[in-house]
Amino acid sequence: MDVFKQSEVWFVIGSQNLYGPKTLQQVMDNAHQVVNSLNSEAGLPVKLVLKPLVTTPDEITALCREANYDTACIGIMTWLHTFSPAKMWIGGLSILNKPLLQFHTQFNAQIPWETMDMDFMNLNQTAHGGREFGFIGARMRQQHSVITGHWQDKEAHQRIGQWMRVAAAKQESQQLKVARFGDNMREVAVTEGDKVAAQIQFGYSVNAYGIGDLVAVVDAVSKGDIDTLVEEYEATYRFTDAVKLNGDKRENLLDAARIELGMTRFLEQGGFKAFTTNFENLYGLKQLPGLAVQRLMQQGYGFGGEGDWKTAALLRILKVMGTGLKGGTSFMEDYTYNFQPGNDLVVGSHMLEVCPSIAKEEKPLLDVQHLGIGGKADPARLIFSTPAGPALNASLIDMGNRFRLLVNVVDTVEQPHPLPKLPVARAIWQAQPSLATAAEAWIIAGGAHHTVFSQAVGVDELRLYAEMHGIEFLLIDNDTTLPAFKNEIRWNEVYYQLNR
Protein backbone atom coordinates (compact mmCIF):
# COMPACT_ATOMS: atom_id res chain seq x y z
CA MET A 1 0.00 0.00 0.00
CA ASP A 2 1.70 3.18 -1.22
CA VAL A 3 -0.70 6.00 -0.45
CA PHE A 4 1.95 8.72 -0.50
CA LYS A 5 3.33 8.35 -4.02
CA GLN A 6 0.78 10.63 -5.70
CA SER A 7 0.67 13.16 -2.85
CA GLU A 8 2.60 16.36 -2.31
CA VAL A 9 2.94 19.11 0.28
CA TRP A 10 3.35 22.64 -0.98
CA PHE A 11 6.25 24.59 0.50
CA VAL A 12 5.29 28.27 0.56
CA ILE A 13 7.49 31.24 1.40
CA GLY A 14 5.77 34.46 2.43
CA SER A 15 7.45 37.84 2.18
CA GLN A 16 6.71 41.37 0.90
CA ASN A 17 7.98 43.47 -1.99
CA LEU A 18 9.62 46.20 0.10
CA TYR A 19 12.69 43.98 0.54
CA GLY A 20 13.57 44.44 -3.12
CA PRO A 21 14.39 41.88 -5.84
CA LYS A 22 17.89 41.04 -4.63
CA THR A 23 16.76 39.98 -1.15
CA LEU A 24 13.71 38.15 -2.48
CA GLN A 25 15.87 36.23 -4.93
CA GLN A 26 18.16 35.20 -2.07
CA VAL A 27 15.10 34.02 -0.15
CA MET A 28 14.05 31.79 -3.06
CA ASP A 29 17.60 30.50 -3.57
CA ASN A 30 17.69 29.48 0.08
CA ALA A 31 14.23 27.93 -0.20
CA HIS A 32 15.33 25.79 -3.15
CA GLN A 33 18.25 24.48 -1.11
CA VAL A 34 16.04 23.73 1.89
CA VAL A 35 13.40 21.90 -0.16
CA ASN A 36 15.95 19.90 -2.14
CA SER A 37 17.69 18.86 1.06
CA LEU A 38 14.46 17.87 2.80
CA ASN A 39 13.32 15.84 -0.20
CA SER A 40 16.61 14.01 -0.59
CA GLU A 41 17.91 13.62 2.95
CA ALA A 42 15.09 13.90 5.50
CA GLY A 43 13.31 10.61 4.73
CA LEU A 44 9.96 12.37 4.40
CA PRO A 45 7.03 10.20 3.27
CA VAL A 46 5.58 12.88 0.97
CA LYS A 47 7.33 15.03 -1.63
CA LEU A 48 7.71 18.76 -0.95
CA VAL A 49 6.94 21.05 -3.89
CA LEU A 50 8.31 24.59 -3.73
CA LYS A 51 5.75 27.15 -4.90
CA PRO A 52 6.51 30.67 -6.15
CA LEU A 53 7.16 33.32 -3.53
CA VAL A 54 3.97 35.05 -2.35
CA THR A 55 4.21 38.75 -1.47
CA THR A 56 0.66 40.12 -1.87
CA PRO A 57 -2.81 39.25 -0.55
CA ASP A 58 -4.00 38.30 -4.04
CA GLU A 59 -1.09 35.92 -4.57
CA ILE A 60 -1.69 34.25 -1.20
CA THR A 61 -5.43 33.87 -1.78
CA ALA A 62 -4.88 32.46 -5.27
CA LEU A 63 -2.40 29.93 -3.94
CA CYS A 64 -4.72 28.78 -1.15
CA ARG A 65 -7.59 28.46 -3.62
CA GLU A 66 -5.40 26.39 -5.93
CA ALA A 67 -4.35 24.14 -3.04
CA ASN A 68 -7.97 23.48 -2.13
CA TYR A 69 -8.76 22.16 -5.59
CA ASP A 70 -5.55 20.26 -6.28
CA THR A 71 -6.20 16.64 -5.27
CA ALA A 72 -2.46 15.89 -5.09
CA CYS A 73 -1.88 18.62 -2.49
CA ILE A 74 -2.50 17.28 1.01
CA GLY A 75 -1.35 20.39 2.86
CA ILE A 76 0.68 23.59 2.92
CA MET A 77 3.97 24.10 4.75
CA THR A 78 4.92 27.74 5.25
CA TRP A 79 8.24 29.34 6.10
CA LEU A 80 8.50 33.00 7.03
CA HIS A 81 12.10 33.57 5.93
CA THR A 82 11.53 37.31 6.21
CA PHE A 83 8.65 39.36 7.60
CA SER A 84 5.31 38.83 5.84
CA PRO A 85 2.60 41.13 7.23
CA ALA A 86 -0.11 38.75 8.35
CA LYS A 87 -3.13 40.80 7.22
CA MET A 88 -2.08 39.70 3.74
CA TRP A 89 -2.84 36.11 4.75
CA ILE A 90 -6.38 36.60 6.05
CA GLY A 91 -8.12 36.08 2.73
CA GLY A 92 -6.16 32.97 1.86
CA LEU A 93 -6.28 31.35 5.28
CA SER A 94 -10.01 32.03 5.57
CA ILE A 95 -10.70 29.76 2.59
CA LEU A 96 -7.90 27.21 3.04
CA ASN A 97 -9.31 23.75 3.77
CA LYS A 98 -6.05 21.80 3.68
CA PRO A 99 -3.82 21.18 6.74
CA LEU A 100 -1.36 23.97 7.48
CA LEU A 101 2.12 23.57 8.97
CA GLN A 102 4.29 26.54 9.93
CA PHE A 103 7.94 25.50 9.78
CA HIS A 104 9.63 27.94 12.15
CA THR A 105 13.18 27.58 10.89
CA GLN A 106 15.94 29.75 9.48
CA PHE A 107 18.51 29.17 6.79
CA ASN A 108 21.56 29.47 9.03
CA ALA A 109 21.86 27.23 12.05
CA GLN A 110 24.19 29.45 14.08
CA ILE A 111 24.72 33.17 14.33
CA PRO A 112 27.82 34.37 12.41
CA TRP A 113 29.09 36.41 15.32
CA GLU A 114 32.10 37.89 13.51
CA THR A 115 30.31 39.00 10.33
CA MET A 116 26.66 39.57 11.19
CA ASP A 117 25.45 42.98 9.96
CA MET A 118 22.07 44.58 9.29
CA ASP A 119 21.86 43.01 5.83
CA PHE A 120 22.04 39.61 7.48
CA MET A 121 19.46 40.63 10.08
CA ASN A 122 17.20 41.97 7.34
CA LEU A 123 17.31 38.68 5.42
CA ASN A 124 16.93 36.23 8.29
CA GLN A 125 13.82 37.34 10.16
CA THR A 126 12.11 34.05 11.00
CA ALA A 127 12.27 34.80 14.72
CA HIS A 128 9.75 37.64 14.44
CA GLY A 129 8.24 36.91 11.02
CA GLY A 130 7.02 33.60 12.37
CA ARG A 131 5.40 35.29 15.33
CA GLU A 132 3.44 37.64 13.07
CA PHE A 133 2.16 34.67 11.09
CA GLY A 134 1.33 32.81 14.28
CA PHE A 135 -0.75 35.70 15.54
CA ILE A 136 -3.10 35.70 12.60
CA GLY A 137 -3.61 31.96 12.92
CA ALA A 138 -4.48 32.36 16.58
CA ARG A 139 -6.65 35.40 15.91
CA MET A 140 -8.62 33.51 13.25
CA ARG A 141 -8.93 30.52 15.61
CA GLN A 142 -7.43 28.40 12.87
CA GLN A 143 -5.97 24.98 13.50
CA HIS A 144 -2.39 25.00 12.31
CA SER A 145 0.68 23.13 13.44
CA VAL A 146 4.04 24.68 14.29
CA ILE A 147 7.40 22.90 14.15
CA THR A 148 10.49 24.77 15.35
CA GLY A 149 14.02 23.67 14.53
CA HIS A 150 16.73 23.92 11.93
CA TRP A 151 15.90 22.38 8.57
CA GLN A 152 18.86 20.00 8.85
CA ASP A 153 17.83 18.76 12.31
CA LYS A 154 16.77 15.10 12.52
CA GLU A 155 14.09 15.75 15.12
CA ALA A 156 12.53 18.38 12.87
CA HIS A 157 12.57 15.88 10.01
CA GLN A 158 10.81 13.30 12.14
CA ARG A 159 8.10 15.75 13.21
CA ILE A 160 7.53 16.97 9.66
CA GLY A 161 7.17 13.35 8.57
CA GLN A 162 4.58 12.77 11.30
CA TRP A 163 2.62 15.82 10.21
CA MET A 164 2.69 14.65 6.59
CA ARG A 165 1.33 11.26 7.58
CA VAL A 166 -1.54 12.84 9.47
CA ALA A 167 -2.25 15.27 6.63
CA ALA A 168 -2.42 12.30 4.25
CA ALA A 169 -4.74 10.55 6.70
CA LYS A 170 -7.02 13.59 6.75
CA GLN A 171 -7.09 13.59 2.96
CA GLU A 172 -7.98 9.90 3.04
CA SER A 173 -10.68 10.54 5.62
CA GLN A 174 -12.35 13.10 3.36
CA GLN A 175 -12.68 10.63 0.49
CA LEU A 176 -13.15 7.37 2.41
CA LYS A 177 -16.17 5.17 1.73
CA VAL A 178 -17.22 2.59 4.34
CA ALA A 179 -19.45 -0.37 3.41
CA ARG A 180 -21.53 -2.06 6.09
CA PHE A 181 -22.50 -5.65 5.24
CA GLY A 182 -25.69 -5.92 7.23
CA ASP A 183 -26.46 -3.64 10.15
CA ASN A 184 -25.40 -3.10 13.72
CA MET A 185 -25.32 -5.99 16.18
CA ARG A 186 -28.72 -5.89 17.83
CA GLU A 187 -28.97 -3.93 21.10
CA VAL A 188 -25.28 -2.90 21.11
CA ALA A 189 -24.84 0.80 21.95
CA VAL A 190 -21.27 1.92 21.34
CA THR A 191 -21.10 0.70 17.73
CA GLU A 192 -24.02 2.96 16.84
CA GLY A 193 -23.56 6.66 16.14
CA ASP A 194 -24.49 9.58 13.95
CA LYS A 195 -23.21 8.81 10.48
CA VAL A 196 -24.31 12.18 9.13
CA ALA A 197 -22.37 13.99 11.87
CA ALA A 198 -19.36 11.80 11.11
CA GLN A 199 -19.47 12.70 7.43
CA ILE A 200 -19.68 16.39 8.28
CA GLN A 201 -16.80 16.11 10.78
CA PHE A 202 -14.47 13.70 9.01
CA GLY A 203 -15.66 13.53 5.41
CA TYR A 204 -16.14 9.78 5.12
CA SER A 205 -19.45 8.24 4.05
CA VAL A 206 -20.98 5.12 5.60
CA ASN A 207 -23.63 3.11 3.77
CA ALA A 208 -25.20 -0.28 4.45
CA TYR A 209 -25.67 -3.10 1.94
CA GLY A 210 -27.89 -6.11 2.28
CA ILE A 211 -25.92 -9.30 2.70
CA GLY A 212 -27.55 -10.53 -0.50
CA ASP A 213 -25.67 -7.86 -2.46
CA LEU A 214 -22.41 -9.39 -1.25
CA VAL A 215 -23.58 -12.99 -1.69
CA ALA A 216 -24.35 -12.36 -5.36
CA VAL A 217 -20.73 -11.32 -5.97
CA VAL A 218 -19.38 -14.20 -3.86
CA ASP A 219 -21.43 -16.77 -5.76
CA ALA A 220 -20.09 -15.48 -9.09
CA VAL A 221 -16.46 -16.30 -8.20
CA SER A 222 -14.97 -18.96 -10.46
CA LYS A 223 -13.32 -22.21 -9.36
CA GLY A 224 -10.15 -21.22 -11.18
CA ASP A 225 -9.84 -18.01 -9.19
CA ILE A 226 -10.41 -19.95 -5.97
CA ASP A 227 -7.69 -22.46 -6.84
CA THR A 228 -5.24 -19.65 -7.62
CA LEU A 229 -5.92 -17.95 -4.30
CA VAL A 230 -5.54 -21.19 -2.35
CA GLU A 231 -2.14 -21.66 -3.98
CA GLU A 232 -1.24 -18.23 -2.59
CA TYR A 233 -2.41 -19.36 0.84
CA GLU A 234 -0.22 -22.45 0.62
CA ALA A 235 2.84 -20.34 -0.20
CA THR A 236 2.17 -17.77 2.53
CA TYR A 237 0.96 -19.73 5.58
CA ARG A 238 1.48 -22.92 7.50
CA PHE A 239 -1.47 -25.30 7.12
CA THR A 240 -2.93 -27.64 9.68
CA ASP A 241 -3.72 -31.14 8.43
CA ALA A 242 -7.42 -30.28 8.41
CA VAL A 243 -7.03 -27.71 5.63
CA LYS A 244 -4.40 -29.47 3.53
CA LEU A 245 -5.42 -31.19 0.32
CA ASN A 246 -7.85 -34.01 1.20
CA GLY A 247 -8.13 -32.70 4.79
CA ASP A 248 -11.55 -32.88 6.42
CA LYS A 249 -11.88 -29.06 6.45
CA ARG A 250 -10.49 -28.41 2.99
CA GLU A 251 -13.91 -27.49 1.63
CA ASN A 252 -14.27 -24.85 4.35
CA LEU A 253 -10.99 -23.33 3.18
CA LEU A 254 -12.26 -23.20 -0.40
CA ASP A 255 -15.43 -21.48 0.82
CA ALA A 256 -13.30 -18.94 2.71
CA ALA A 257 -11.30 -18.22 -0.46
CA ARG A 258 -14.53 -17.70 -2.39
CA ILE A 259 -15.73 -15.23 0.25
CA GLU A 260 -12.43 -13.33 0.16
CA LEU A 261 -12.54 -12.98 -3.61
CA GLY A 262 -16.16 -11.86 -3.52
CA MET A 263 -15.59 -9.32 -0.75
CA THR A 264 -12.52 -7.95 -2.50
CA ARG A 265 -14.41 -7.47 -5.75
CA PHE A 266 -17.36 -5.85 -4.02
CA LEU A 267 -15.09 -3.39 -2.22
CA GLU A 268 -13.03 -2.62 -5.31
CA GLN A 269 -16.07 -2.10 -7.51
CA GLY A 270 -17.59 0.31 -5.00
CA GLY A 271 -14.37 2.15 -4.17
CA PHE A 272 -14.62 1.16 -0.50
CA LYS A 273 -11.53 1.20 1.72
CA ALA A 274 -13.26 0.11 4.94
CA PHE A 275 -16.10 -2.23 5.80
CA THR A 276 -17.97 -3.96 8.60
CA THR A 277 -19.57 -7.36 9.06
CA ASN A 278 -22.01 -8.74 11.61
CA PHE A 279 -22.34 -12.38 12.65
CA GLU A 280 -26.10 -11.79 12.97
CA ASN A 281 -26.33 -10.94 9.25
CA LEU A 282 -24.82 -13.88 7.38
CA TYR A 283 -27.73 -15.17 5.29
CA GLY A 284 -26.34 -16.79 2.15
CA LEU A 285 -22.72 -16.96 3.35
CA LYS A 286 -21.45 -20.36 4.37
CA GLN A 287 -19.25 -19.02 7.18
CA LEU A 288 -18.41 -15.85 9.04
CA PRO A 289 -15.71 -14.04 7.03
CA GLY A 290 -12.56 -14.48 9.09
CA LEU A 291 -9.62 -15.22 6.84
CA ALA A 292 -10.98 -12.79 4.25
CA VAL A 293 -11.20 -9.98 6.78
CA GLN A 294 -7.71 -10.67 8.13
CA ARG A 295 -6.15 -10.57 4.69
CA LEU A 296 -8.07 -7.48 3.61
CA MET A 297 -6.89 -5.64 6.71
CA GLN A 298 -3.31 -6.59 5.88
CA GLN A 299 -3.83 -5.03 2.44
CA GLY A 300 -4.81 -1.75 4.10
CA TYR A 301 -8.58 -1.98 4.45
CA GLY A 302 -10.29 -0.77 7.60
CA PHE A 303 -12.59 -3.18 9.41
CA GLY A 304 -15.04 -3.18 12.28
CA GLY A 305 -16.95 -6.11 13.71
CA GLU A 306 -20.66 -6.12 14.51
CA GLY A 307 -21.33 -3.12 12.29
CA ASP A 308 -18.76 -0.89 14.03
CA TRP A 309 -18.25 1.66 11.28
CA LYS A 310 -16.36 4.17 13.45
CA THR A 311 -13.64 1.63 14.24
CA ALA A 312 -13.54 0.50 10.60
CA ALA A 313 -12.93 4.05 9.44
CA LEU A 314 -10.38 4.72 12.18
CA LEU A 315 -8.48 1.56 11.28
CA ARG A 316 -8.21 2.66 7.66
CA ILE A 317 -6.98 6.08 8.80
CA LEU A 318 -4.26 4.51 10.96
CA LYS A 319 -3.31 2.16 8.14
CA VAL A 320 -2.65 5.24 6.01
CA MET A 321 -0.69 6.99 8.77
CA GLY A 322 1.46 3.93 9.38
CA THR A 323 2.30 3.16 5.76
CA GLY A 324 5.96 2.19 5.52
CA LEU A 325 6.57 2.26 9.26
CA LYS A 326 7.74 -0.67 11.33
CA GLY A 327 4.93 -2.51 13.07
CA GLY A 328 1.35 -3.30 12.17
CA THR A 329 -2.15 -2.09 12.92
CA SER A 330 -5.24 -4.17 13.56
CA PHE A 331 -8.84 -4.31 14.67
CA MET A 332 -8.80 -5.42 18.30
CA GLU A 333 -10.95 -6.07 21.34
CA ASP A 334 -10.02 -6.26 25.02
CA TYR A 335 -11.07 -9.84 25.70
CA THR A 336 -9.91 -11.06 29.10
CA TYR A 337 -7.65 -10.11 32.00
CA ASN A 338 -4.82 -11.68 33.95
CA PHE A 339 -5.10 -10.29 37.49
CA GLN A 340 -1.78 -11.09 39.12
CA PRO A 341 0.22 -8.84 41.45
CA GLY A 342 3.00 -7.25 39.44
CA ASN A 343 1.87 -8.92 36.22
CA ASP A 344 -1.58 -7.64 35.30
CA LEU A 345 -2.18 -8.40 31.64
CA VAL A 346 -4.84 -7.93 28.97
CA VAL A 347 -5.44 -10.49 26.24
CA GLY A 348 -6.70 -8.77 23.12
CA SER A 349 -8.31 -10.70 20.31
CA HIS A 350 -11.61 -11.14 18.50
CA MET A 351 -13.69 -14.01 17.21
CA LEU A 352 -11.48 -14.25 14.13
CA GLU A 353 -10.59 -10.84 12.78
CA VAL A 354 -7.07 -9.83 13.84
CA CYS A 355 -4.75 -8.41 11.18
CA PRO A 356 -1.59 -10.42 10.31
CA SER A 357 0.37 -7.17 10.04
CA ILE A 358 0.91 -7.49 13.81
CA ALA A 359 1.96 -11.16 13.62
CA LYS A 360 5.19 -12.24 15.28
CA GLU A 361 5.40 -15.38 13.17
CA GLU A 362 6.72 -15.05 9.64
CA LYS A 363 4.14 -17.61 8.51
CA PRO A 364 0.94 -17.60 10.58
CA LEU A 365 -0.97 -20.85 10.99
CA LEU A 366 -4.05 -21.29 8.79
CA ASP A 367 -6.73 -23.49 10.31
CA VAL A 368 -10.47 -24.16 10.31
CA GLN A 369 -12.10 -24.64 13.69
CA HIS A 370 -15.54 -24.47 15.21
CA LEU A 371 -17.04 -21.07 16.05
CA GLY A 372 -19.94 -21.27 18.44
CA ILE A 373 -21.53 -18.01 17.31
CA GLY A 374 -23.23 -17.08 14.07
CA GLY A 375 -24.74 -20.49 13.36
CA LYS A 376 -22.67 -21.15 10.26
CA ALA A 377 -20.02 -23.61 9.09
CA ASP A 378 -16.63 -23.67 10.80
CA PRO A 379 -14.66 -20.65 9.53
CA ALA A 380 -11.07 -20.37 8.36
CA ARG A 381 -8.72 -18.11 10.25
CA LEU A 382 -5.05 -17.21 10.73
CA ILE A 383 -3.60 -17.91 14.18
CA PHE A 384 -0.57 -16.03 15.51
CA SER A 385 0.84 -14.06 18.43
CA THR A 386 2.19 -10.51 18.52
CA PRO A 387 5.77 -9.32 19.18
CA ALA A 388 6.69 -7.39 22.30
CA GLY A 389 7.03 -3.63 22.09
CA PRO A 390 5.25 -0.31 22.53
CA ALA A 391 1.73 0.00 21.17
CA LEU A 392 -1.54 1.81 21.68
CA ASN A 393 -5.26 1.19 21.58
CA ALA A 394 -7.48 3.87 20.05
CA SER A 395 -11.25 4.23 20.12
CA LEU A 396 -13.46 6.75 18.33
CA ILE A 397 -16.80 7.27 20.07
CA ASP A 398 -19.84 9.44 19.46
CA MET A 399 -20.65 11.51 22.57
CA GLY A 400 -23.71 13.15 21.05
CA ASN A 401 -22.38 16.70 20.88
CA ARG A 402 -18.88 15.71 19.77
CA PHE A 403 -16.64 12.84 18.76
CA ARG A 404 -14.06 11.66 21.27
CA LEU A 405 -10.77 9.98 20.34
CA LEU A 406 -9.58 7.95 23.32
CA VAL A 407 -6.08 6.47 23.37
CA ASN A 408 -4.40 4.13 25.85
CA VAL A 409 -0.66 3.55 25.58
CA VAL A 410 0.23 -0.09 26.24
CA ASP A 411 3.32 -2.29 26.34
CA THR A 412 2.91 -5.47 24.33
CA VAL A 413 4.59 -8.48 25.94
CA GLU A 414 5.67 -11.85 24.69
CA GLN A 415 3.02 -14.48 25.24
CA PRO A 416 4.06 -15.85 28.66
CA HIS A 417 2.58 -19.34 28.22
CA PRO A 418 1.42 -21.52 25.33
CA LEU A 419 -2.24 -21.27 24.37
CA PRO A 420 -2.81 -24.65 22.72
CA LYS A 421 -6.60 -24.47 22.89
CA LEU A 422 -7.10 -20.86 21.76
CA PRO A 423 -7.76 -20.98 17.99
CA VAL A 424 -7.50 -17.24 17.29
CA ALA A 425 -4.82 -14.59 16.82
CA ARG A 426 -4.07 -12.47 19.88
CA ALA A 427 -1.98 -9.72 21.41
CA ILE A 428 -1.07 -9.51 25.09
CA TRP A 429 -0.20 -6.26 26.77
CA GLN A 430 0.29 -4.34 29.98
CA ALA A 431 -1.82 -1.20 30.04
CA GLN A 432 -0.30 2.10 31.15
CA PRO A 433 -0.21 3.29 33.89
CA SER A 434 -1.74 0.11 35.32
CA LEU A 435 -4.56 -2.21 34.40
CA ALA A 436 -6.76 -0.79 37.16
CA THR A 437 -6.27 2.87 36.28
CA ALA A 438 -6.39 2.29 32.52
CA ALA A 439 -9.56 0.23 32.67
CA GLU A 440 -11.31 2.64 35.01
CA ALA A 441 -10.33 5.68 32.94
CA TRP A 442 -11.39 3.93 29.73
CA ILE A 443 -14.78 3.02 31.17
CA ILE A 444 -15.32 6.49 32.66
CA ALA A 445 -14.57 8.03 29.25
CA GLY A 446 -17.00 5.69 27.49
CA GLY A 447 -14.34 3.96 25.40
CA ALA A 448 -15.58 1.18 23.13
CA HIS A 449 -14.84 -2.51 23.56
CA HIS A 450 -13.54 -2.45 19.99
CA THR A 451 -10.28 -0.60 19.34
CA VAL A 452 -7.60 -0.03 16.77
CA PHE A 453 -4.37 -1.59 18.06
CA SER A 454 -1.18 -0.22 16.54
CA GLN A 455 2.52 -0.85 16.93
CA ALA A 456 3.26 1.56 14.06
CA VAL A 457 1.41 4.79 14.86
CA GLY A 458 2.11 6.85 17.98
CA VAL A 459 0.25 9.19 20.29
CA ASP A 460 1.54 12.35 18.59
CA GLU A 461 -0.02 11.42 15.27
CA LEU A 462 -3.39 10.65 16.82
CA ARG A 463 -3.41 13.84 18.87
CA LEU A 464 -2.65 15.81 15.71
CA TYR A 465 -5.38 13.97 13.81
CA ALA A 466 -7.87 14.98 16.49
CA GLU A 467 -6.67 18.59 16.33
CA MET A 468 -7.02 18.70 12.55
CA HIS A 469 -10.63 17.56 12.84
CA GLY A 470 -11.52 19.62 15.88
CA ILE A 471 -12.51 16.64 18.02
CA GLU A 472 -11.81 15.76 21.64
CA PHE A 473 -8.64 13.82 22.47
CA LEU A 474 -8.13 11.93 25.73
CA LEU A 475 -4.90 10.09 26.59
CA ILE A 476 -4.34 7.34 29.15
CA ASP A 477 -0.63 6.72 29.75
CA ASN A 478 1.94 6.53 32.53
CA ASP A 479 1.18 10.13 33.55
CA THR A 480 -2.56 9.53 34.00
CA THR A 481 -4.25 9.86 37.37
CA LEU A 482 -7.97 9.34 37.73
CA PRO A 483 -8.75 12.65 39.50
CA ALA A 484 -6.97 14.65 36.79
CA PHE A 485 -8.53 12.53 34.05
CA LYS A 486 -12.03 13.11 35.41
CA ASN A 487 -11.36 16.84 35.64
CA GLU A 488 -10.18 16.91 32.02
CA ILE A 489 -13.44 15.30 30.94
CA ARG A 490 -15.44 17.86 32.93
CA TRP A 491 -13.50 20.78 31.44
CA ASN A 492 -13.86 19.35 27.95
CA GLU A 493 -17.61 19.03 28.45
CA VAL A 494 -17.84 22.76 29.15
CA TYR A 495 -15.55 23.66 26.24
CA TYR A 496 -17.45 21.65 23.66
CA GLN A 497 -20.81 22.94 24.89
CA LEU A 498 -19.57 26.51 24.49
CA ASN A 499 -17.85 25.78 21.17
CA ARG A 500 -20.88 24.31 19.40
Curated annotation (Swiss-Prot):
* Enzyme class, spelled out: isomerase
Report the co-factor binding details: Binds 1 Mn(2+) ion per subunit.
- Provide the cofactor list for this protein: Mn(2+)
Positions bound to Mn(2+): 306, 333, 350, 450
Instruction: List, alphabetically, the SUPFAM superfamilies matched.
Output: FucI/AraA C-terminal domain-like, FucI/AraA N-terminal and middle domains
Protein's UniProt keywords contain Manganese:
yes
Any one Gene Ontology molecular-function term assigned to this protein's record = L-arabinose isomerase activity
Choose any GO biological process term that the UniProt entry carries and state it.
L-arabinose catabolic process to xylulose 5-phosphate
Q: Which UniProt keywords apply?
A: Arabinose catabolism, Carbohydrate metabolism, Isomerase, Manganese, Metal-binding
Name the domain of life this protein comes from: Bacteria
Report the pathway entry: Carbohydrate degradation; L-arabinose degradation via L-ribulose; D-xylulose 5-phosphate from L-arabinose (bacterial route): step 1/3
Record-stated family: Belongs to the arabinose isomerase family.
User: What is the protein name given in its UniProt record?
Assistant: L-arabinose isomerase
Q: Upper lineage ranks? A: Bacteria, Pseudomonadati, Pseudomonadota, Gammaproteobacteria, Enterobacterales
